[in-house]
Amino acid sequence: MLKTLMNAFKIKELRNKILFTFAMIVVIRLGSQLPVPGVNRDFFASWFAAQGAGAFSFFDAFTGGSFTNMSIFALNITPYITSSIIMQLMTIAIPKLEEMQKDGEEGRKKIASITRYVTVVLALVEAAALAIGFGRSGLLQEYNVLNIMIVVVALTAGSAVVMWIGERITEKGVGNGISIVLVINIISRLPQDIAGLYEQFIKGKAIAVGVVAAIIILAVMIAMIVLVIILNDGVRKIPVQYAKKVQGRKFVGGQSSNIPLKVNTAGVIPIIFASSILEFPIVICSLFGIQGSGFWGEILKGMSSSNWCNLSAPQYSIGLVVYIIMVIFFAYFYTSITFNPLEISENMKKQGGFIPGIRPGRPTCDYLNKILYYIIFIGACGLTIVGILPFIFNGLFGASVSFGGTSLIIIVSVILETIKQIESQMLVRNYKGFLND
């Protein structure tokens, strides 16, 4: 990777793109330290610390700590991520949007424009909920209409600026800008997580105990990274053969190809969906100061990921079971709406393609579905293992880390994709980076 970057710096165009990307990253990190006017940051920091691991910790990891700092970038890129997921689902549910998506570059530009508007609306709603919900409890130095409006405008504008920076990185930098911003936010929390693990397992312990703890932590991290790489790059290739056709005096066609089915087709979406649904009631109750009691209080505690692996309260582990089931369900659900075996089989039939040993048309569709279901299950199980490890660490050892399975999947996939993009641009210019190794 380092050799690739060094070779990329030898090319003026790529060097400028990389430097532009770094400059935009610096702007985002600086903006993450600028406080929102009229906000009591100490109150929010102490409140957040009392929450422990959970929905807000997950949210803070995606904002790079901007949320706990209550900076102008507190909402960061999260409204855009939510907006993108909503639009992706809507293109399946609404035929007009689906046609727009298939309408080439012009259609994609229209969808991107709609996504921006939805992002601003979501940011506005989230900012208003924060200002009004927490404002009464002490978030605002003075709880009045003016301060509420200032906070709402500042947070909404901050989210819009981060979205704009992400798009500029995509246009003038390297990689997907939104993904780069998200990865930088997650990585910015890494030193804090390492310090927390050091305090929990190594500091004050005997040298031998500290060394063993460090080795175990390192081994777990390496195992997680290996599993994530397998999930990210694992592919089942279905061979496809194309029949030969006679055109004039020549035979054309007859080539071999394949249909790549990724092990983890849905990416981190199942984890995000499952976590969001389970933690949403907790977030709403926190915003409006609702303290659940009795039966409903127990339900809320069961939804909180910080209680799932609590040995002193094993009844809350039912929340972990529900989480695992939801991750597997959403892995199947999301893949079913983004991957259409029937459409693929019909296109193959029109082009004279077939899977060896399988009849074209409906039998091909059934075969793809059968293979896909097995692959999704394997990917969903791997995704679940990566996703629940942080909860186990938190419950059994009290180690609260934001650098969990979801973060790791995002980081690995974005880094690998960015490297591939740099490599492809270098190959165009007869550079081969580490591909020569």
What are these regions (language model features)?
Residues M1-Q101, E105-D437:
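N-terminal cationic and glycine-rich segments that engage phosphates or anionic surfaces
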